[in-house]
Amino acid sequence: MDKLDDKSRAEIVFVGSTLGPLFLHDPEHDAQVVVAGLEALASLDVEAAAKDWPFVSAEDAKRALALMHEGLAEGTKSDALVWEYRRLFVGPLAKPAPPWGSVYTDKDMVVFGASTMQLRDWMRRNGIAIEKGKSDEPEDHIGTMLVLLAWLAEERPELVDEFLRDHLLTWSSHFLEQLEEAAEQPFYEGLANLTRKSLEGLQEERELEVAYPRFYR
């Protein structure tokens, strides 16, 4: 496969850095982190943005962005948005689609499972570490992995394909389909769809052959 060119790197950075934080941060408690991104999505010209969204057809991007835009109609800290984030990603009740890869790929369906350890080992071997205090989540949280994807495209582009093929694409579509189905608020339904379509489009562009594991959930 070809070396990542500057355009592809910039597009990957955009996708990962735009979508990743939306999975990681509570719209109310972490507003200072995500408010700019949420406000940008709330004021978006959906049709124009869809034409420019990387790795996704304009029609598919428009459908997903319209859902996200609709979900922000009552504001970036609306009760519906905040409580849906907490239902999906925080708890205390069981999460309908847990955001960690090993929950799906480990036979015991646990966090910090075998695939998490494989990712951690890959990061260690390549001298990559998540800054302390940035996240308490396992490394295979979907948001953490999207942010890491953006960082790799910017700082270590030679590792992007391997990271995608061996660690992210192995489970991302499976999880994101479940999240899209579980979402009861249009913002997160659209987020799940747009993220899945973006990663699948990136996989196609990079011509990556992924060995999918058995899913236990």
Label every model-predicted segment.
Residues M1-R217:
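Charged, alpha-helix-forming regions
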